[in-house]
Regions:
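Extended, alpha-helix-rich binding/interface surfaces that flank or overlap catalytic cores
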Residues: 8
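Short, solvent-exposed beta-strand edge segments and adjacent coil->beta transition regions
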Residues: 2, 108-112, 161-163
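C-terminal substrate-recognition/cap domain of FAD-linked oxidoreductases
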Residues: 128-204
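Hydrophobic alpha-helical scaffolding
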Residues: 4, 116-117, 166-170
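FAD-binding subdomain of flavoenzyme oxidoreductases
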Residues: 11-12, 16-136, 140-141
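Short, well-ordered strand-loop elements centered on a beta-strand within folded domains, enriched
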Residues: 3-5, 73-78, 152-153
Length: 204
């Protein structure tokens, strides 16, 4: 599915509206609750969902846009996906984007999982194993322990370790637990992401 939206729309509001139709945005920055969709397209590159859908500039994510030229006599122009590429991640330097046509995904219930790991090489290996497993993932990210130390208490917990952040559908949780067991590491299920007061969507 697709959605046509004006660039000043907040991504958090847009996602709520899409939920009414069983859809959601494919890609989100960590600032998705307060960022505008136009700002994300003009200055962003990827984020939550990139493990699944790649980056904003990858074919299929931005379907088209409208922009006003920045010359003496401004004109409103419409661009298809290929024509939109020069304006994608151009910070508005070659035109003022006024509306976007972007691809959406089926709305799923995503569950947030944190895995504690000691060695960085092992941490990378575990994440690679998770990304190649037959599970639906929306997020797969590593935070080194030095970064974790700067995080809020609710997130970093008591163990000083590297952390893998995952968002998976309910069906993938058991597989992730089995992978953790295989590598001898612990994991913690935070819960369904959109019902959490504090979720990992705000820390990546």
């Amino acid at each position: 599915g697709f959605v046509k939206v004006q660039t000043g729309c907040l991504m958090g509001d847009l996602n709520k509206e899409l939920e009414k139709y069983g859809r959601e945005l494919r890609l989100l920055p960590s600032t998705w609750k307060t960022a505008t969709i136009g700002g994300f397209i003009a200055g962003g590159s990827g984020g939550i969902g990139s493990i699944r859908w790649g980056f904003l500039r990858d074919p299929g994510n931005l379907i088209g846009l409208e922009a006003v030229t920045i010359n003496e006599e401004p004109k409103l122009l419409r661009f298809d996906a290929q024509e939109s590429e020069p304006l994608n991640h151009a910070y508005g330097t070659n035109g003022i984007i006024t509306s976007l046509l972007i691809a959406t995904d089926i709305k799923r219930k995503w569950y947030s999982i944190i895995i504690d790991c000691e060695g960085l090489n092992k941490t990378i290996e575990i994440l690679k194993t998770c990304t190649t497993a037959a599970i639906d993932l929306k997020l797969g990210a590593i935070l080194e322990k030095e970064i974790v130390d700067q995080m809020p208490t609710w997130f970093k917990g008591k163990s000083k370790s590297h952390k893998i952040l995952l968002q998976s559908t309910l069906g993938g949780i058991k597989t992730i637990e089995l992978i953790c067991k295989k590598y001898g590491v612990g994991s913690f299920l935070l819960g369904q992401e959109d019902k959490l007061t504090n979720g990992i969507s705000e820390v990546v």
